[in-house]
Regions:
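Hydrophobic alpha-helical hairpins/lids featuring a short glycine-rich hinge
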Residues: 1-8
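FAD-binding core of flavoproteins
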Residues: 10, 15-126
């Protein structure tokens, strides 16, 4: 990283609504948490969402991992890897930074007093 002057962010938390896979399984819906969907000669193909990628909009790559313990049946979600921010199918959804335009601190508690650059990372398989 130092040699190539790479700035990396991390995405280590599934979206809160996706932390209960049973909800999606009962409705026959795909679980939105980032998962391995296939493997090929080039490596693994991933798809889904991860959160808390602070400053990812400024990063060269994002380190994917898991901060919250996973259940034994969540093998596909247990990937740890780094992905370049210019990867095909990668989208970064960020909170609005420095929300001084709100009328009060209650409407934007995190970004009222400081810059807030946490990002939701979505990766569509390609």
């Amino acid at each position: 990283m130092k040699k190539n002057d790479v700035f990396a962010s991390y995405a280590v938390v599934p979206p809160q609504a996706a932390r209960n896979p049973e909800f999606y399984q009962k409705r026959n819906l795909p679980i939105p948490t980032l998962s391995v969907v296939s493997e090929n000669d080039k490596g693994v193909v991933i798809s889904g969402m991860k959160m808390l990628a602070t400053s990812a909009i400024f990063a060269n790559e994002i380190w994917i991992g898991n901060l919250i313990p996973l259940a034994p049946d969540q093998v596909k979600q247990s990937i740890t890897c780094a992905i370049p921010c210019n990867s095909n199918g990668l989208s970064l959804w960020m909170r609005q930074p420095l929300s001084k335009h709100y009328d009060n601190q209650f409407d934007a508690p995190l970004s009222w007093n400081q810059d807030e650059t946490d990002v939701l990372v979505t990766k569509m398989k390609h």
